[in-house]
Amino acid sequence: MTGILFDLDGTLLDTLDDLMDAVNHTMAAFGYPQHTRAEVRRFVGNGAGRLLQLSVPQGQDWQEPLAAFQSYYREHCQLKTAPYPGIMEALYALKKYPMAIVSNKPDAAVKKLCAQYFPGIYAQGEQPGCPRKPSPDMVRIAMEHIGVDRCVYVGDSEVDVLTAHNAAVPCLSVLWGFRDKAEIQAAGESRFCEAPAQMPAMLEEMIKELDNGQ
């Protein structure tokens, strides 16, 4: 059976404003400079730890700010976040396929957001004992959980392309997220989707190719 695995931030949900607010709330609490939306956009994608490493001034400890960020974001992750226009309709069109969401966002925030927007879809975020993407571990765990032996992976960043490559699954890269096409292309082979309305047909075609052994 073939399934579909989705990244969360920048793929299904536009989380950037809530992430920026949480970063800047944390920076203010520690007396550090604020960051622009464009800066935070570049920082995200490799987990909360890396986000805070890039956010604090070079050479400063990031562990204490990380704990503060996670605490604040967990309580404020739903203020400005919403699905990208057309995402809910695309998921409905794909409802016959087993689906899962795998994210480098902290697991508590992933489960909170997915319970609100994508109830019934298995979702996993970063948690102790499971390497974050681009390790293939999250993909393999999700595939086992939803009972599929093949899948197509959908994401918006170079991390997602590398994750799919490491898991030996085909990748569909969306262009409405946190990275531009050139950054994604530099990471490796992928197909590109320009709008959520195009996603069901593109995924259907990729699944057909996968099922036919192409």
Predicted segments, located by residue:
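Non-catalytic pre-domain segments flanking phosphatase-related domains
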Residues: 1-6, 201-204, 209-214
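Active-site neighborhood of HAD-like aspartate-dependent phosphohydrolases
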Residues: 1-42
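A metal-dependent, Asp-based hydrolase signature
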Residues: 42-75, 93
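Short, acidic loop-to-helix structural element flanking the phosphoryl-transfer center
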Residues: 75-101, 107-114, 136
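Substrate-recognition "cap/lid" segment bordering the active-site pocket of phosphatases
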Residues: 79, 106-154, 158-167, 181-183
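Glycine-rich phosphate-binding loop signature in dinucleotide/nucleotide-binding domains
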Residues: 95-97, 145-149, 206, 210
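Short acidic-hydrophobic, aromatic-tinged amphipathic segments that line or gate anion-handling sites
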Residues: 191-195
